[in-house]
Amino acid sequence: MKRNTESAFKWIVGILQRHNVSFQISGGFAARLYGSNRELADIDIGIPDDAFEVIYPDIKSFITHGPEHYKDNEWDLKLMTLKYEGQVIDLCGRDTIRIFDKQTKEWIPAHRDLTISEDKEVYGIMVPVIPKEALIAYKKKILREVDIADINALENLV
């Protein structure tokens, strides 16, 4: 199935808004909104940890993972992955999210405050996006190849 990012974005944002769930666009999708041009992998959206159960009835048939605690080499968080019209969407719990700082070799809190955002228009909808500085800051901590590409693109924009 061909990926329909716009349709998936409008679908999940509509559900979050209908349930009055605070949210924030982050990750590679946010980086693209700020000017990175790398290929989009998924749509990352931060939500409060207790919001998963609120939206569950509306999204349950699209869940491919979770909601559950997830930890890998970079992330430690509550995570649920959805697939809608070929587009992967990661819903990330923001209350306890941590990232692994590759410089200090320590787990540290990631940007958690969903009220500190930049409003951006995406597909005709105004949505809260992680501030560019916070996005760059966490990408400088986890330093995956995609993060380095985003950092280079975002820091070199005039």
Feature locations, PLM:
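Compositionally biased terminal segments of proteins
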Residues: M1-V158
